[in-house]
Amino acid sequence: MEAQRQDGKLASSLSLGKYHISEEYGFLLPNPLEELPDHYKPWMEIAHRLPHLIESHQLQAHVYEMPLLDCRFLTSYREQRLAHLVLAAITMGFVWQEGEAQPQKVLPRTLAIPFVEVSRSLGLPPILVHSDLVLTNWTKRNPEGPLEIGNLETIISFPGGESLQGFILVTVLVEKAAVPGIKALVLGVEAIRQHSQDTLLEALQQLRLSIQDITRALAQMHDYVDPEIFYLVIRIFLSGWKDNPVMPVGLVYEGVSTEPLKYSGGSAAQSSVLHAFDEFLGIQHCKESVDFLHRMRDYMPPSHKAFLEDLHSAPSLRDYILDSGPGGCLMAYNQCVEALGELRSYHINMVARYIISAASKARSRMLTRLSPHALEDRGTGGTAVLSFLKSVREKTMEAILCPGA
C-alpha cells in the first residue's frame, strides 16, 4: 500500500511546469529577458561591451569603478536569471582578462556582493554555469521565426567572435533537441505506473529519436566553431577556480568571505539532459564519475535538480522491463541505450578535436604561452576529461539488457 501511494505521488509530481521545465523549450528558459531595470544600467553597459573590454585589457578598470548596487529591485525570477548571467560573465572576464598566467585572485566587493546575493536567491553558485551561458543566453532575431541557428543570437558574449556565438547557440539547439526526450521520460514513468507496455514502447521510441536528434544537433559544432579559437580564446573564460592548477586556492569574494572560495567552471555535465536520461534508463556509473556528476547538480537550477531526484525515485524502468520478459520494450530500451552510447562516443570525438588535438597543434606552433596549457587535458569543470567521458560511455553500454537476463 505504501509503495502504491509513493508511486502515485511521484507520477503526479512529474509535471514539467513544477520544475521550471517548458513544454516547448525544455530546460531552456523561455524567451529570456535581454535587459535589466534601469537601476542596473552600470552592469549592462559593461556586459554588452565584454569582448571589447577584455581584448583591450580595460575590463578590470571598469569593474573597479562599478557602483555597489542593491539587488532588491530584481523583482522577478527572469530578472534574477539575467542578473546572474550578467554578473557571472563580468566575473569570468575580470578573473581571466590577462589569461591563465595572471588570473585575478580577489573579486571586488561591488561585483562580489551582488553576485553572491543573486546566486543565493537562485540557489546557484557565484560562477558562470551552464544555465547562464546557454539556458538564459539566447534570443530570436525574428520572434516569429524558427529556433535555428540563423535566427538566434546570444545576449551576452565573450571574445571568440562567431566561434563563441556558435558554441553557445549550437548548445541551445542541443537543449531544444532534448525536449521530446524529456517529455518521453514523464510519459514513460506514467506508463510504468499504469503497467501500459504500449505507452512505454511509445515513450522509449520517442526518447531514442530525441537522443539521435541531439547527436545531429551537436554535429553542427563543427560547422560553427573553430577548434583553435575555442582552445586558445574561448576556453579560458569557461574555466573555474576549483581543481584548477593555476588557481589552486580559489577566489576571494571581497565583502563576502575573507577565505578563498572554490567553484568549478562550466561543463556539459551541468546540463540536466543526460542526467535525466541516465536516471530514467537506470545507467549506473562508477563512483568517481557519480561523485563528479552529482556535484555538477549543485550547479543547476534547484528545480531542475529536483526533477532529477524525483526521476531517481520513480519506479525502475529496468526492473519493469526485466519483469515483463522479452518483447518490444526490451528492444526499444536497448536502442535507447545504444543511441546514448553513440552520443557519448560523438562527444568524446568532439572533445578530442577541440581540446586534445587543439592543444597539440598549439604546442607544435609554439603557441603554448598563449594557451591555457595547465588545463589542456582537463575539462573546464575540472575533470580529466577523456578518461571521464570514456568511463561514462563504457558504463552506458554496460546497461544493455540481454533477453532472459
Curated annotation (Swiss-Prot):
Transmembrane regions: none
Keywords: Dioxygenase, Heme, Immunity, Iron, Metal-binding, Oxidoreductase, Tryptophan catabolism
Sequence positions that bind heme: 347
One Pfam family from the record: IDO
Taxonomic superkingdom: Eukaryota
Molecular functions (GO terms): heme binding; indoleamine 2,3-dioxygenase activity; metal ion binding; tryptophan 2,3-dioxygenase activity
Entry EC no(s): 1.13.11.-
Coiled coil: none
Catalytic activity field: L-tryptophan + O2 = N-formyl-L-kynurenine
Pathway assigned to this chain's UniProt record: Amino-acid degradation; L-tryptophan degradation via kynurenine pathway; L-kynurenine from L-tryptophan: step 1/2
Enzyme class: oxidoreductase
Gene3D superfamilies: 1.20.58.480
GO biological process, one term: 'de novo' NAD biosynthetic process from L-tryptophan
Activity: how regulated: Activity is inhibited by D-1MT (1-methyl-D-tryptophan) and MTH-trp (methylthiohydantoin-DL-tryptophan) but not L-1MT (1-methyl-L-tryptophan).
GO cellular component, one term: cytoplasm
Protein purpose: Catalyzes the first and rate-limiting step in the kynurenine pathway of tryptophan catabolism. Involved in immune regulation.
Family: Belongs to the indoleamine 2,3-dioxygenase family.
More details: Ido1 and Ido2 are 2 distinct enzymes which catalyze the same reaction. Ido2 affinity for tryptophan is much lower than that of Ido1. Ido2 may play a role as a negative regulator of Ido1 by competing for heme-binding with Ido1. Low efficiency Ido2 enzymes have been conserved throughout vertebrate evolution, whereas higher efficiency Ido1 enzymes are dispensable in many lower vertebrate lineages. Ido1 may have arisen by gene duplication of a more ancient proto-IDO gene before the divergence of marsupial and eutherian (placental) mammals.
Entry protein name: Indoleamine 2,3-dioxygenase 2
Lineage of the species this protein comes from: Eukaryota, Metazoa, Chordata, Craniata, Vertebrata
Name of the encoding gene: Ido2
